[in-house]
Regions:
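Exposed, low-structure sequence patches enriched in small/polar residues
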Residues: 2-362
Length: 362
């Protein structure tokens, strides 16, 4: 419902939905059933005002969800409830002056989980700044800070099976996460020359209060949630370069991605005497990806498209263990013939994946 006034615009929004999600896992040992019921409602009111390039909006609402799960076999908690109610307020501001545009969003939410008897104050402030030098050049900067809780499956306190050999145990803990994200972006475009280039640098850091401990045996992998403050961070540098040649009916592009991820992992191991102990290790993963693409359309009745993906990644665990870098290469070729209103397409794909130990799969 929207009401326009001279001083601004009022908007009233209400949504209610119900979802039933049955799932089952059938194995030789027996059958596990997950019957999940979700009743969700969100009701809000918002006020919007624009004046002389300045926009302000204030939104307030109440949000609730009744989420229940019945799990079989009954040796685990079979009637789980993660119902919660929240009150939220979201002020938003935008200012545009000439070549500059800036925004500020300040969401704030107070949330209560009834069965867990826990209350939280969540937030997600973010800001965005854009500078458009001229028609060709534009730059932007973005930053955000978000505190959130785990989803429905994260809150389940017991042990449950996800596939034929993987188990997860919430261990009765309540996971929370605080993430900060920063992004720097730039672009250049020249439509006359059909030349475009973009580049982005993104950094993200997450701080968590829990960490999954991994235990591996011959017939099972068990992930048990432990109360252990930890963090992870990642860097991503990406760029896309595209060039079209109109006279040749040709379009080309190249996308490059370079990323690095760091974090901590917890593994449960047995010593020489058979005693179980937990080992906390740092890890690092580096990845490089290149995607060239060519589209050639010399006539209305024919088009050829070539698309390749080249990925190269390597890992480091602790201070001594370095895993062999692996190369993945995928090539795709599509030939399209148009006869009247009928399109005939021939496609071919080639895969080459490194498996380690100087072996690969084609």
């Amino acid at each position: 419902l929207i009401r326009n006034r001279e001083s601004g615009t009022w908007e009233f929004h209400s949504v209610t939905q119900y979802a039933y999600q049955p799932a089952s896992l059938l194995l030789e040992e027996g059958k596990s059933k997950f019957n999940q019921h979700n009743f969700y409602t969100d009701n809000s009111a918002a006020y919007l005002r624009k004046h002389n390039g300045f926009t302000q909006q204030y939104k307030a609402g109440i949000q609730g969800e009744r989420a229940t799960l019945k799990y079989t076999p009954t040796k685990q908690p079979n009637d789980f409830n993660a119902s919660h109610l929240s009150l939220y307020l979201t002020p938003y501001f935008q200012l545009e002056r000439g070549k500059w545009l800036t925004t500020l969003s300040l969401p704030l939410k107070a949330e209560r989980y009834f069965s867990q008897q826990r209350s939280f104050l969540f937030f997600n402030p973010s800001t965005y700044l854009r500078y458009k030098l001229d028609y060709h050049w534009a730059f932007s900067l973005y930053g955000s800070l978000k505190r959130s809780a785990g989803d429905f499956s994260d809150l389940y306190p017991g042990l449950y099976q996800t596939d034929y050999r993987t188990w997860r145990d919430g261990n009765g803990l309540f996971p929370t996460n605080t993430t900060q994200t920063y992004n720097l972006y730039g672009e250049y475009k020249n439509t006359v020359q059909e030349f475009f280039i973009t580049a982005a640098l993104t950094y993200s850091r997450s701080n968590r209060n829990t960490l999954f401990e991994q235990s591996v045996s011959e017939d099972a992998i068990v992930y048990t949630r432990r109360e252990l403050p930890n963090h992870s961070d990642s860097w991503n540098l990406s760029s896309t370069l595209s060039k079209g040649i109109y006279d040749w009916h040709l379009k080309t592009s190249l996308t490059l991605l370079l990323s690095r991820s760091n974090g901590e992992q917890l593994t449960r191991l047995a010593d020489s005497k058979g005693n179980q102990q937990s080992l906390l290790q740092t890890y690092r993963y580096d990845y490089l990806k290149a995607e060239p693409k060519i589209i050639w359309s010399p006539a209305d009745v024919f088009e050829a498209e070539y698309h390749a993906t080249l990925g190269y990644g390597g890992s480091k665990i602790g201070s001594d263990t370095r895993l062999t870098p692996l190369l993945d290469f995928v090539q795709r070729l599509h030939l399209t013939f148009s006869i009247g209103q009928v399109d005939l397409r021939l496609s071919g794909e080639h895969y080459r994946n490194d498996l380690g130990g100087n072996t690969h799969l084609n």
